[in-house]
Structure formats: structure tokens, C-alpha cells
Amino acid sequence: MTDLPKIGKPATNALAIVGIDQIEQLSSVTKSNLAHLHGLGPKAIEILEKSLLELGLSFSLVSPDLPELPFFLIGDLACDNAPKRRIVRDLAMSLYAKGLAYDGSLMVDDVVYRAPYSNLVLIGRDQVVSGAIRLTDISSIEVFQILSHGKEAALHGKIVDKQGTLTYFSMFFVFASHKKDSAVSQIMHYQQT
């Protein structure tokens, strides 16, 4: 493994916050996704790209099943042949990303969303889409793990805002049926700053 090149303290710190301290780790990240990371400018990205090329590596290509997001996303993102993992990943990111157009299509009409840490209960797709916890200043989200089995799924991770504040979160999902393309009927959401 090779240490990161000199890219300036803000850029190095931004990468450290999301757990990147070796140049090889960047081969699993897209260049456009990296640009969303607060503190990492075009000059630093150019230097990182040159360092990757020197090692015979490059930034990752865009994953065709990953939605375009206004923040840096890293972690357990591959959904391979697990459609419910993709649904959970995409729904969680859509609920967090303020300003991201989302129609609620991954949820049933009478979905129930609970956030016990804020005593919030929302019932119905429209209420969840408009009232779920959405953050405006997300710099990055790291998904630690996504699990799915039968009618249930869960994911947990870490959010870093543009001020550097860390928020740990987890979401638990219940699907309407066991079918692979089933919509979500219940969401339980926890987070701690």
C-alpha cells in the first residue's frame, strides 16, 4: 500500500475522515463522487489521479446502478445479485439527501417511518418523502454494511457534514413481501451525533 501524495492538509483531512489514507483505496471511488467530498478541490483530485496512474490504477468507473448524489458516498455499495440491498441503499440515500428529487417509488402507499430519537412517526408515502430527516450539508456518507434476508433489511453507517460533525445512523426496513422487487412497508431510523 502507498501513502497518499502531498495534496494539502484540507484534502488529506477530508480523505482521512472517510477512512482513506492509501492511494490504492481510491481505485474503488469514482472521480465524480470524490469531487463531492468537502475539502477536496480539483488540484488535489488531479494529483491523486496522476498518483493512481503511476501505480497502474485509475478511479473507478461509474456504477450503473448507483444514483447520482450530491455528496461523497463510500462503503458497502455493491448490490450484485441482491435487489433488496439496492432498494435499501437507494432509499436510505434518497431519504437523507435534501434537494434530491425522489418520488417514493420504493415504498408502499401506506409506509410507516419511525425515528424514535426525535419522536417522529410518518405514515404514508407523501409524508415520508416530505417529512423524513433530510440533511442539507452532507459532505460524505460511508455505508458500513447492508444486510437483507427475507422481508427484512438493514444498513448502518456514518455521515460527515461540511463542518466535520460525525453522525452515526442505522435504518431497518420491512418489505411488503418476500419478492425481490417488493416495496418497503416500514422504516425504523436511528441516528446519534
What is the predicted function of each stretch?
Residues 63-97:
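Short, low-complexity N-terminal intrinsically disordered segments enriched in polar/charged residues
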Residues 73-76, 129-193:
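A beta-strand edge to alpha-helix "cap/lid" segment located at domain peripheries
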Residues 42, 82-86, 121, 126:
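Contiguous, function-dense segments enriched for cysteine-driven chemistry
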Residues 1-71:
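Compact, charge-rich alpha-helical regulatory domains located at protein termini
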Residues 100-149:
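A solvent-exposed, acidic/Ser-Thr-rich amphipathic alpha-helical stretch
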